[in-house]
């Protein structure tokens, strides 16, 4: 099996702090009200849970928008935390600005 065929879940240690946060917080429930900020029309974007987790990660790691973009591109634990797979496209820096304004 090659690296890209691996499951991201297998590549992040079981005791990683981000996993602990995922086990403590029900993000679906937490973001229930935020779903109202999204329309069902138009092309789909990133799931609101992923966006909210990305903003939380940006805050916890003290990242600028561009740093958050790069962090999610390069950091496997960050991808796992936000619900992105190894090959998934992650948000560009402008996404973080847009999401904060929306919510």
Where are these regions (language model features)?
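Short alpha-helical elements
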Residues: 1-103
């Amino acid at each position: 099996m090659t690296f890209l065929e691996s499951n991201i879940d297998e590549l992040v240690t079981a005791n990683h702090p981000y996993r602990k946060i995922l086990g403590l917080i029900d993000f679906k429930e937490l973001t229930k009200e935020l779903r109202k900020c999204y329309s069902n029309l138009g092309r789909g974007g990133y799931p609101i849970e992923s966006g909210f987790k990305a903003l939380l990660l940006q805050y916890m790691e003290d990242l600028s928008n561009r740093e958050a973009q790069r962090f999610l591109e390069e950091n496997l634990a960050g991808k796992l935390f936000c619900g992105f797979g190894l090959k998934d496209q992650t948000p560009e820096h402008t996404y973080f600005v847009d999401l904060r304004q929306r919510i």
